[in-house]
Amino acid sequence: MIPRSYSQAIALTGLMMLVGLASSARAEVQEFNRRATATAQIMAGISPAGSDLALERRTKLDAFVEHQKWMAVQWSQARGRISAMQDWRSREINIPGTAQKTLLYPFSGPDFLNAYTLFPDHSQYIFFSLERPSSLPDLESVTPVQFGKLLEDVRNAFRDIFQRNYFITDYMSKQLTTPWIRGTVPVMATMMALMNQRIIRIEPVDLFPELTRAYEARDTVKHPRMIMRGVRIVFVSAGGGAQQQLYYFSVDATDKALEFYPGFLEWVGQHRPASALLKSASYLLHDNQFEKTRNMILAAADYVVQDDTGIPYRFLHQAPWQVRLYGRYNKPIKSLRYGYQADLKGAYKEKSDLAELPFPFGYHWRGKQSGLMIASR
């Protein structure tokens, strides 16, 4: 059974979000959830400061000492890339009124790292992809041996994003379904800890509870292959300031699958003004199976940062959009050759003054081969 009015539900949800953000902005120093923050810090290889003695004891174990060393080395290398991204962002990304903007990040996986590095001042972030959100692990309940396996799973989940600056979907299906690390929430929370954020709360979100109940019944109605699950993470910088929030939804975003959730893209698209981030997206928006998602982004966003795997260049190389190109264009990797864009290749050839992109972005991550575009209107 479909709810009588999606628009009413969507309007109410949006109002509640705005009220919450407005009230949080008044406080300079925010209280935070110490257990959730400490859990994220331990997974990030950071010894948490505080009075949570149960978790503090975990940091004395050899497994944590080993994990801390590994994370320190990997994060030190990643910090060089992030610093280059931050410097580039300060010069090239100029968005007025960012404190009231939403970042849309389709096919995101748990990639808070790139989203927050490029768009740190947005008030909220909306991610969606196939991977389940799940929840933080309970570090107090696991044995020392299990704790060691959990930290090993964290390292496995971070190898690709640290090395390549993107996640590999096929690998994530295994990395985020272990007995100890399940879903995107543990990875996003760990990234928040690495970026010096404090978690205020993590809570499930169900945009369409009537649909969820109907689809979970299964014997009463035709149901989707995967039922949408959502989560909201409210967080704040360790240095204080206004709260920010991240919505993450696991959903099949093909046009056919979205027929089961006809209000989802309407809900996402109502959050304006919006920016959009698209990277390492397997050229999904080049496929007519994702036409609804592509059209939603083109309608809702007035600022898009993407590599060549995002919205096809032909949709942006026209009024009212203005496009700036960075780095270089390379043919898609072997398994994704169908994403080749002759018009984008030509646009790069016409530019004689293109600066190298000083960080890896997308599938061509080796040897300064990456390209990126900013489209604005």
Across the structure, where does each feature detected by a protein language model lie?
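Non-globular targeting/processing and membrane-anchoring segments
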Residues: 28-159, 237, 243-377
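Long, charged/polar, surface-exposed segments that mediate recognition or autoinhibition
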Residues: 155-162, 186, 190-196
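Thiol-based oxidoreductase modules, predominantly thioredoxin-like and allied folds used
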Residues: 125-175, 200-220
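Active-site/pore-lining binding-face segments in mid-to-C-terminal subdomains
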Residues: 192-266
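Sec/Tat signal peptide C-region and signal peptidase I cleavage site
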Residues: 21-27
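Bacterial N-terminal signal peptides that target proteins for export
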Residues: 1-13
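Short, thiol/selenol-centered motifs that function as redox-active sites or metal-ligating centers
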Residues: 108-120, 126-127, 164-189
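Cleavable N-terminal signal peptides
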Residues: 13-15, 25
